[in-house]
């Protein structure tokens, strides 16, 4: 009886989303109570504290650079299928999430820049609201279970991948991160080998994964966020092979699904959501920095996505994914305002660890904006999506 109930609970379409947010809530509570020392001991294990060098192996590093690369591998596999055989299988449909991602980066940056124009010291933070935390956005979608159409979730995943790539480019160009040319060259060579394997219809999945691990190491050493390796490997694993119905990409995607939903995403949430609000005062909520970030996330993200895609559709540069309308896009675009971990990462680069007060203000804006965007996006989608009628959602994240 208990086993049957547990099985039903685990296999519920919304179980992954519930688990992710439960892990995030546990992290926030621990980080702001007497359990803070225990929380830090867990996420920085085996290091002693957050003061360890970024290269020091810890649970946080393992999750963010290692396990999240696996998550992006699963997302990359899914988006590749949709680009070749699914909801994005034409040029105008594939262009839709790309244009949406562009609008979702430009508009928040503009709004932030306008709201902080009077404070030159804050100009460096323009990219903070341009980022989307794909893990938490997918987590909110998972809470809606099978009500989410396949095409809408695929749109979100494709947009988030492009957004993440955009964030990597922004960080490399504007935030003076040191890149290692030799490691980049090695990564390029590995990508070239995998591309040749794909073209030659090499079917050994283990060989792709082995080279993928090498690519991950090269990208990690290059100074670029290592999760990029997951996207690249997902795009290079063959979807179909001649003279066979076997799909290596689909087989790997289905195998990864439960690991992503029930282990990787909850661990990511727990390791990254523990934001300490110590020292935050009510007055912090109405200063220009948090207001600019929150406005960029809550207003800029959906506004940019909707405006850019509406113009693109009008000019016939893009087409809406099948089965959804602009009201679905507008509601899903609100979820892209969940900046959270990527926004915090950019804030640390923009203002440096030697300016703790500014970092606290930035985190207030990121956390408040992300929570508002998540709640509004969830409520809007819940209002416009039909009640579940069986299956219909895609696997990653829910």
From Swiss-Prot:
GO terms for cellular component: plasma membrane. It is found in: Cell inner membrane. It catalyses: Na(+)(in) + 2 H(+)(out) = Na(+)(out) + 2 H(+)(in). The keyword Transmembrane applies. It comes from the Bacteria. Pfam families: Na_H_antiport_1. Keywords: Antiport, Cell inner membrane, Cell membrane, Ion transport, Membrane, Sodium, Sodium transport, Transmembrane, Transmembrane helix, Transport. InterPro entries: Na/H_antiporter_dom_sf (IPR023171), NhaA (IPR004670). GO terms for molecular function: sodium:proton antiporter activity. The chain crosses the membrane at residues 9-29, 57-77, 95-115, 124-144, 154-174, 177-197, 204-224, 226-246, 255-275, 288-308, 329-349, 359-379. It is a multi-pass membrane protein. One of its GO terms (biological process) is regulation of pH. Na(+)/H(+) antiporter that extrudes sodium in exchange for external protons. Belongs to the NhaA Na(+)/H(+) (TC 2.A.33) antiporter family. This is Na(+)/H(+) antiporter NhaA.
């Amino acid at each position: 009886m208990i086993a049957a109930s547990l099985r039903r609970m685990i296999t519920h379409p919304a179980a992954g989303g519930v688990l992710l947010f439960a892990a995030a809530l546990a992290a926030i509570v621990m980080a702001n109570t007497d359990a803070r020392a225990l929380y830090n001991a867990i996420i920085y294990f085996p290091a002693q504290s957050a003061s360890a060098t970024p290269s020091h192996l810890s649970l946080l590093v393992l999750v963010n650079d290692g396990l999240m690369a696996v998550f992006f591998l699963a997302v990359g596999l899914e988006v590749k299928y949709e680009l070749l055989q699914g909801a994005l299988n034409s040029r105008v449909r594939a262009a839709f999430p790309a244009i949406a991602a562009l609008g979702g980066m430009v508009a928040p940056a503009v709004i932030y820049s306008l709201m902080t124009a009077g404070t030159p010291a804050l100009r460096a933070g323009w990219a903070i609201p341009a980022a989307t935390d794909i893990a938490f956005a997918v987590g909110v979608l998972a809470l809606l279970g099978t009500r989410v159409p396949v095409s809408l979730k695929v749109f979100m995943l494709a947009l988030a991948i492009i957004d993440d790539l955009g964030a990597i480019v922004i960080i490399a160009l504007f935030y003076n991160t040191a890149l290692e040319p030799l490691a980049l060259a090695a990564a390029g060579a590995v990508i070239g080998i995998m591309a040749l394997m794909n073209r030659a219809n090499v079917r050994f999945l283990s060989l792709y994964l082995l080279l993928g691990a090498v690519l991950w190491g090269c990208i990690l050493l290059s100074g670029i966020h290592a999760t990029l390796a997951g996207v690249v490997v997902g795009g290079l694993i063959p979807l179909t092979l001649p003279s066979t119905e076997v799909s290596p990409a689909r087989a790997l995607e289905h195998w990864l699904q439960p690991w992503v939903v029930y282990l990787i995403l909850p661990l990511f949430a727990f390791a990254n959501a523990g934001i300490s609000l110590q020292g935050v005062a009510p007055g912090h909520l109405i200063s220009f920095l948090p207001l600019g970030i929150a406005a960029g996330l809550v207003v800029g993200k959906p506004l940019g996505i909707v405006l850019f895609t509406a113009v693109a559709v009008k000019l016939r540069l893009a087409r809406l994914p099948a089965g959804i309308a602009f009201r679905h896009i507008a509601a899903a675009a609100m979820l892209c305002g969940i900046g959270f971990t990527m926004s915090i990462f950019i804030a640390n680069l923009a203002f440096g660890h030697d300016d703790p007060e500014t970092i606290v203000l930035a985190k207030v804006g990121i956390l408040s904006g992300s929570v508002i965007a998540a709640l509004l996006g969830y409520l809007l989608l819940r209002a416009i999506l039909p009640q579940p009628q069986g299956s219909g959602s895609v696997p990653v994240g829910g």
